[in-house]
């Protein structure tokens, strides 16, 4: 599985 988190 793949989990990606992006914040700005």
Swiss-Prot record:
One GO cellular component this record assigns the protein to is: extracellular region
Superkingdom of the source species:
Eukaryota
Q: In which tissues is it expressed?
A: Chorionic epithelium (trophectoderm) and placental cotyledons.
Q: Which UniProt keywords apply?
A: Aspartyl protease, Glycoprotein, Hydrolase, Protease, Secreted
Which pairs of positions does the record mark as disulfide bonds?
Answer: none
Single annotated GO MF? aspartic-type endopeptidase activity
Q: Does the keyword DNA repair apply?
A: no
Q: How is it modified after translation?
A: Glycosylated.
- Key word Disulfide bond present: no
**In the Enzyme Commission scheme, what number(s) does this protein have?**
3.4.23.-
Secretion signal: which residues? none
Intracellular or extracellular location(s): Secreted, Extracellular space
GO biological processes: proteolysis
Q: What else is known?
A: On the 2D-gel the determined pI of this protein is: 4.7, its MW is: 50 kDa.
Family (UniProt): Belongs to the peptidase A1 family.
Name of the protein in its database record? Pregnancy-associated glycoprotein 50F
Q: Which organism is it from?
A: Bison bonasus
